[in-house]
Structure formats: structure tokens, C-alpha cells
């Protein structure tokens, strides 16, 4: 199976299955000398691990990370950083029944058709647990970028019909609730909505939003390495994501050139923008403004409500999916979205180091 690697210089390869022995990641291109320990990674993994609220899967996993290589005496060595998280709470028998049919909204049918064989236990590589490796790699990227003043603020913007009110926006509220919403009123309304979903044996989707600040001008390369194009690829590669937009996104299609253009102004002796409809990118490069994007996440496809499908013999059947599943995955996806964004920015930053001859010359003059 191809397609398990992402990035050019800061390159991430994930491996493992939901019900295998473990899941992990190899991160190549990490600069030497970055202070790094398992706790730096664990903080991020704790944000996505299951069983933290009634709105997430009851599967209990510590998701404790082990760094296997690439770190010595608390610092990265410049060699590949390899990490693993061992699975400890698999209940594969919960999935034995689904080996004979195709779950609506899942990759079962496509895996069977493409490979002629699939790991039906929790979805194998198409499981949400695959994102463990992404989050571990993203933690390294965030640590690296934070030292350069680049910060990430990622949160749940909406759940089902409930959207945060910008007037009530409070960044401190994000980590005070299990839904990762920056609006206390929206948390209450979203919780009530999710309770109704649970009662009806159903699930919900939502939207994650990410704001990246401290970016220099010029990250990203025309034409096929545009920063917004690479972010779209990174975010859309997350299994549950069905939509991506940056800045005003699809609303830009309703605007006029005059209302959509961001006027340039001088501010503190530097070129700046009066507005940020573009979401922090121009011509596929960062423009120094906050980079703002959103990811639309579909409802969890594994639901206990009765659904119609077919089995491998081609017979029409009715199913009710058993097992331990999230009624909503948006809150746990927040850190995954942040991780993929950080990986993309880290890769673009390293690629940008060779963009100008004077920077290369200055570097070698210091040697």
C-alpha cells in the first residue's frame, strides 16, 4: 500500500492498524538540536485519546508514546525520529460480524475492491487511530515552530447546527470543555444536541478552525507547492474531513473584487493588510497575516441506528453497528487538524531556507 508518507523535507510516515500491536510514525528531516522528550509528544496525544467524555468512544487507551530513535540526551540528533504507541484495549470480537458486509460511510467496500483483502478490525489503516502517528509528528513540528514564534490556535467552530458566536469567543475556554469550543454558551447548546444524537442512536459532524500566527512572508512555492494547496492536501488526508476552506473560502465566490481584495497599508513601518479575506495567503505563499482555515468533518459513520447495506454475497441486509464508537469525532480531530497544519508549515519553512541566494551565502559566511 502506497500513500503513507507526507512532506518533502520534514517527512512523516505513519504505520500500524487500529487493532494491531501498535501504531507509530517515522519523522525524517527534524533538525538536530531541538530539545525533545516523550512528555512533549504525550501532551498532544492526550488531546486526541479516547474515553475522555461521554461524547467520545469508551475505548480506554493510555496512548503512551515511546521514542525509539532520533533523540539523545534530550535533543534531536538530526536522524529519523521514530515513535510508537502500543494498543492495549482492542476488542476485535466486536468487529467479527462486519467481516461479511460493508458498513455505510466506511472504506470497507473500496478496500475489498482495490486490494482483494481488508483488515476489518476497527477499519485497519482507515481507522481514526491512524492519526496517532500524525499527532506525534505534529507535536514535534509545533515544538520546532513555537521556538520561532509561530503559534497555533485550533478549536471546534461548530457541532451540527450549533456554531460559536464570535462575540463570546474566549480562547481560554477551549481547554475548559471536552468539546474544545471557545464559547461557553455554544458548549451547552452543542451538548444538548449531542445528547439527542445519542438518544436516537445517531452521530454528528462539525467544523474545526485553525488560526496560525507569527508566520513570515513567503512560505510556500508556486506553482505546485502552494502553502494553501499543501494545507488542503494535508487536512483532506484526515479520514473524516470532507471539506476545506481558507480565509473567506466559498463566501469569496459571492463577493466582488472590491469587497474581496485586502487593501495594503503601512503599519509600524511595515507593509500590512487592512483586512484578511484571503486568510493569510497570496499567490500560494504566506503574506504575514494570520493564516486561517476551516475543516468540515463528517458525522461518525459507525452508528447503532438501523442502516441498509449489502453483504459480500451481494444480498441486501439491515445492520446496526455494535462496538465502541464516538457519537462525534470533531473534538478529538481538533489536535489532528493542528498537527497536520504544523507538519505542513514546518516542511514549507525548511523548503524556504533555500529560496534566496543571499540567504545561502549568509549561511556559508558564518561557517
Provide a role label for each language-model segment.
Residues 1-59:
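N-terminal, positively charged regions that mediate nucleic acid binding
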Residues 11-14, 119-130, 217-221, 276-281, ...:
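A short glycine/serine-rich beta->alpha loop
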Residues 99-124, 307-327:
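Short acidic, glycine/tyrosine-flanked loop/strand segments centered on an H-E-D-like triad
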Residues 15-21, 201-204, 208-316:
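Glycine-rich anion/phosphate-binding loop at the beta-strand->alpha-helix junction
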Residues 113-223:
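Glycine-rich, mobile lid/loop segments that gate access to catalytic sites or pores
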Residues 11, 302-367:
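Internal helix-turn-beta structural module
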Residues 21-33, 128-150, 225, 229-233, ...:
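Alpha-helical support elements that line or immediately flank enzyme active sites
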Residues 44-104, 108:
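Glycine-rich, N-terminal phosphate-binding loop and its surrounding beta-alpha-beta segment
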Amino acid at each position: 500500500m502506497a500513500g503513507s508518507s507526507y512532506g518533502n523535507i520534514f517527512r512523516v510516515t505513519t504505520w500500524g492498524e487500529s487493532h494491531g500491536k501498535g501504531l507509530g510514525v517515522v519523522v525524517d528531516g527534524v533538525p538536530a538540536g531541538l530539545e525533545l522528550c516523550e512528555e512533549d509528544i504525550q501532551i498532544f496525544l492526550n488531546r486526541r485519546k479516547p474515553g475522555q467524555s461521554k461524547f467520545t468512544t469508551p475505548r480506554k487507551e493510555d496512548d503512551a508514546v515511546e521514542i525509539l530513535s532520533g533523540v539523545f540526551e534530550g535533543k534531536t540528533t538530526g536522524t529519523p525520529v521514530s515513535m510508537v504507541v502500543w494498543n492495549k484495549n482492542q476488542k476485535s470480537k466486536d468487529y467479527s460480524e462486519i467481516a461479511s458486509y460493508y458498513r455505510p460511510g466506511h472504506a470497507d467496500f473500496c478496500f475489498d475492491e482495490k486490494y482483494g483483502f481488508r483488515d476489518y478490525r476497527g477499519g485497519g489503516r482507515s481507522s481514526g487511530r491512524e492519526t496517532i502517528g500524525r499527532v506525534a509528528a505534529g507535536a514535534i513540528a509545533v515544538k520546532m515552530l513555537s521556538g520561532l514564534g509561530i503559534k497555533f490556535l485550533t478549536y471546534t467552530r461548530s457541532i451540527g447546527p450549533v456554531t460559536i458566536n464570535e462575540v463570546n469567543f474566549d480562547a481560554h475556554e477551549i481547554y475548559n470543555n471536552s468539546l474544545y469550543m471557545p464559547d461557553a454558551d455554544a458548549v451547552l447548546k452543542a451538548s444538548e444536541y449531542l445528547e439527542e444524537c445519542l438518544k436516537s442512536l445517531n452521530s454528528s459532524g462539525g467544523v474545526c478552525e485553525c488560526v496560525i500566527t507569527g508566520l513570515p512572508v513567503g512560505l510556500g512555492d508556486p506553482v505546485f507547492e502552494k502553502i494553501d494547496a499543501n494545507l488542503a492536501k494535508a487536512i483532506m488526508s484526515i479520514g473524516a474531513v470532507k471539506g476545506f476552506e481558507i480565509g473567506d473560502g466559498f463566501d469569496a465566490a459571492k463577493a466582488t473584487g472590491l469587497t474581496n481584495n485586502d487593501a495594503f497599508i503601512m503599519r509600524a513601518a511595515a507593509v500590512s493588510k487592512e483586512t484578511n479575506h484571503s486568510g493569510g495567503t497570496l499567490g500560494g505563499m504566506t503574506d504575514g497575516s494570520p493564516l486561517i482555515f476551516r475543516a468540515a468533518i463528517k458525522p461518525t459513520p459507525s452508528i447503532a441506528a438501523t442502516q441498509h447495506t449489502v453483504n459480500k454475497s451481494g444480498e441486501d441486509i439491515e445492520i446496526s453497528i455494535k462496538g465502541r464508537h464516538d457519537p462525534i469525532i470533531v473534538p478529538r480531530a481538533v489536535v489532528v487538524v493542528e498537527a497536520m497544519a504544523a507538519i505542513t508549515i514546518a516542511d514549507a519553512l525548511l523548503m524556504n531556507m533555500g529560496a534566496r541566494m543571499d540567504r545561502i551565502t549568509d549561511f556559508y559566511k558564518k561557517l
